[in-house]
UniProtKB/Swiss-Prot annotation:
Keywords: Amino-acid biosynthesis, Aromatic amino acid biosynthesis, Lyase. It catalyses: 3-dehydroquinate = 3-dehydroshikimate + H2O. This is 3-dehydroquinate dehydratase. It is an enzyme of class 4 (lyase). The gene is aroQ. GO terms for molecular function: 3-dehydroquinate dehydratase activity. It comes from the Bacteria. The active site is at 24 (proton acceptor), 99 (proton donor). Catalyzes a trans-dehydration via an enolate intermediate. Homododecamer. It comes from Hyphomonas neptunium (strain ATCC 15444).
Length: 147
């Protein structure tokens, strides 16, 4: 059985669809995860969201052990979590960072990024579609490219 792609989300992503839809869009996290599962074919998707930094770090460690790739929207932890950065540095699998909005075009405090330096790439500002692009990259980089 092939290893899954992990799709992990940080704080407040459980509010997608209702929280600042003019910035984050109207898709819920469940909508996004359902689309990824449909696009992944026979590759399993492990999709989780948490508002807890420690839990997110534990899931990154699990993905490092059990996953083929990691798609991560760390949300606000992108800008604050050295613990998350340190966990991500241990990955031997591709890490694709995703943001629904473009943090570089927003408030100055969002310009600090502890995830990007350890990611293969970052997709930002494309809304929910960014997750689909991230899945395509994750599959290609982990050897499961779709034609």
């Amino acid at each position: 059985m092939s290893k899954p792609v992990y799709v992990l989300g940080g704080p407040n992503l459980n509010l997608l669809g209702t929280r600042e839809p003019e910035i984050y869009g109207r898709d819920t996290l469940e909508d996004i995860h359902a689309r990824l599962r449909a696009l992944a074919g026979d590759v399993a998707i492990v999709a989780r969201q948490t508002n807890s930094e420690g839990e997110l770090v534990s899931w990154v460690q699990e993905a490092a052990r059990d996953g083929r790739a990691l798609i991560l929207n760390a949300a606000a932890y992108t800008h604050t979590s050295i613990a998350l950065h340190d966990a991500l540095k241990t990955l031997k699998i591709p890490l694709i960072e995703v943001h629904l909005s473009n943090p570089a075009a927003r408030e100055a405090f969002r310009h600090v990024n502890y995830v990007a330096p350890v990611a293969v790439g970052t997709i930002a500002g494309l809304g929910a579609y960014g997750y689909e692009l991230a899945l395509s990259a994750a599959l290609r980089l982990s050897g499961e490219a779709r034609s």
